[in-house]
From Swiss-Prot:
GO CC annotation terms, alphabetical: cytoplasm
Name recorded for this polypeptide: Transcriptional regulator WhiB4
Record family assignment: Belongs to the WhiB family.
Gene transcribed to yield this protein: whiB4
UniProt cross-references to InterPro entries, sorted A to Z: 4FE4S_WBL, Whib
Keywords: 4Fe-4S, Cytoplasm, Disulfide bond, DNA-binding, Iron, Iron-sulfur, Metal-binding, Transcription, Transcription regulation
GO biological process: cell redox homeostasis; negative regulation of DNA-templated transcription
Protein species of origin: Mycobacterium marinum (strain ATCC BAA-535 / M)
Cofactor(s), by name: [4Fe-4S] cluster
Record flagged with keyword Cytoplasm: yes
Keyword Signal found: no
């Protein structure tokens, strides 16, 4: 998962803006604790190039794949495999849908359309 490290050791505006509310933090802890990759060596998920597709295999049956992908897209996480998506796949989605404010909402709407 990502973290913010101020260069000079002091908190900055960016880090303050990225703090989660208590409810958001609890929600995130809830889904992260269910992730299949939680016990995986992070080095296996933060690989480059074609190795990312191989790394994404663990995501296929993950019960929180949608939440993970939405979190990575909402936070514009640049590196690693998240929600079964490679870096390139996430960049493409962000470029194709710059209007999306909440990727969780976007995925839910898309899921409802495909079911109904």
């Amino acid at each position: 998962m990502s973290g913010i490290r101020p260069v000079d050791g002091r908190a900055n505006l960016t880090s303050a803006q990225n703090l989660l509310s208590t409810g958001e933090a609890e929600e995130r802890i809830n889904w992260v604790s269910k992730a299949l990759c939680r016990a995986t060596d992070p080095d296996e998920l933060f690989v480059r190039g074609a190795a990312q597709r191989k790394a994404a295999v663990i995501c296929r049956h993950c019960p929180v794949m949608q939440e993970c992908g939405a979190d990575a897209l909402d936070n514009k996480v640049e590196f690693g495999v998240w929600g079964g998506m490679t870096e390139r796949q996430r960049r493409a989605l962000l470029k194709q849908h710059p209007e999306v404010v909440s990727w969780s909402d976007y995925f839910e709407k898309r899921k409802r359309r495909s079911v109904g």
